[in-house]
């Protein structure tokens, strides 16, 4: 649930807050495919479809799009359950995020040992 501190000048949830949560949710999915840390290298196709309001219950759904040698591409879809409209569930945002596996020196590494 997002709070009033997360709002923009229009009284809806600031897009940057949603992007931050997309990044976190996608990283959890990416980590399923490597024992290394992952870093975000790109956010593609970000689409804010509908606003998110204070009090909405927001859910993030992830799925693998592509597994490369060092990278993982993840689709993240965001839904909001409206607290004021009979618990209506609407898709509010989607994005594809690319993560790269890195070592302790922040150098890209293979997702899995050879």
Region spans (language model):
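Conserved interaction-surface patches within small, structured recognition/assembly domains
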Residues: 41-51, 59-65
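Hot-dog-fold acyl-thioester-processing enzymes
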Residues: 1-42, 100-114
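N-terminal, well-ordered alpha-helical segments
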Residues: 20, 56-60
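Preference for bulky hydrophobic residues occupying beta-strand positions
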Residues: 1, 41, 46, 76-78, ...
């Amino acid at each position: 649930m997002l709070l009033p501190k997360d709002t923009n000048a229009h009284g809806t949830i600031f897009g940057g807050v949603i992007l931050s949560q997309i990044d976190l949710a996608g990283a959890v999915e990416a980590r399923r495919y490597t024992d290394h840390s992952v870093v975000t290298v790109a956010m593609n196709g970000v689409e804010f479809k509908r606003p998110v309001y204070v009090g909405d219950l927001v859910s993030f759904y992830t799925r693998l799009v592509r597994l490369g040698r060092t990278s993982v591409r993840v689709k993240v879809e965001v839904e909001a359950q409206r607290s004021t409209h009979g618990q209506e569930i609407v898709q509010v945002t989607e994005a594809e995020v690319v993560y790269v596996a890195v070592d302790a020196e922040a150098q890209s590494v293979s997702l899995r040992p050879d």
